[in-house]
């Protein structure tokens, strides 16, 4: 399969923007799953890592932007069905099921767990500022 064939087949894959899974966004702003199941601020790389964990073929497109908010750059294309119409992963048949699975995996992503550990220890420091009484 040459590059042209691959590119044309990727065009038929489903698109997942990080906004679809972002719990900080409203439905009007583009979230596609319930806020209780969504995760805060997912990235394209985290979504792609979750797709590879779920054994779903995917392609990251970092040069593409979300149409409603063009400051949010990046999207992931995923292949849910093979050419014959059968699902790639029998446990995941629809795009919504895939988005829910990814949203469950993103908070457990190794990049997030490493970021949160140092932040928790550094915020437990002393508080600065004047603590005197205010005059009436």
UniProtKB/Swiss-Prot annotation:
The outcome of changing residue 31 to Q is:
Abolishes RNA binding
Example GO biological process term?
A: SRP-dependent cotranslational protein targeting to membrane, signal sequence recognition
User: Where found in the cell?
Assistant: Cytoplasm; Nucleus, Nucleolus
Give a Gene Ontology cellular component term annotated to this protein. nucleolus
Alphabetically ordered keywords of this record? Cytoplasm, Nucleus, Ribonucleoprotein, RNA-binding, Signal recognition particle
Q: Where is this region: Disordered?
A: 106-136
Classify the main location.
cytoplasm
Q: Write down the InterPro entries for this protein, in alphabetical order.
A: Signal_recog_particle_SRP19, SRP19-like_sf
Q: Name one GO molecular function term.
A: 7S RNA binding
Per UniProt, subunit arrangement is: Component of a signal recognition particle complex that consists of a 7SL RNA molecule of 300 nucleotides and six protein subunits: SRP72, SRP68, SRP54, SRP19, SRP14 and SRP9.
UniProt lists the family membership as follows: Belongs to the SRP19 family.
Per the entry, what this protein does is: Component of the signal recognition particle (SRP) complex, a ribonucleoprotein complex that mediates the cotranslational targeting of secretory and membrane proteins to the endoplasmic reticulum (ER). Binds directly to 7SL RNA. Mediates binding of SRP54 to the SRP complex.
Q: Which PANTHER family match?
A: SIGNAL RECOGNITION PARTICLE 19 KD PROTEIN, SIGNAL RECOGNITION PARTICLE 19 KDA PROTEIN
Q: What is this protein called?
A: Signal recognition particle 19 kDa protein
As recorded in Swiss-Prot or TrEMBL, the protein's gene is named SRP19
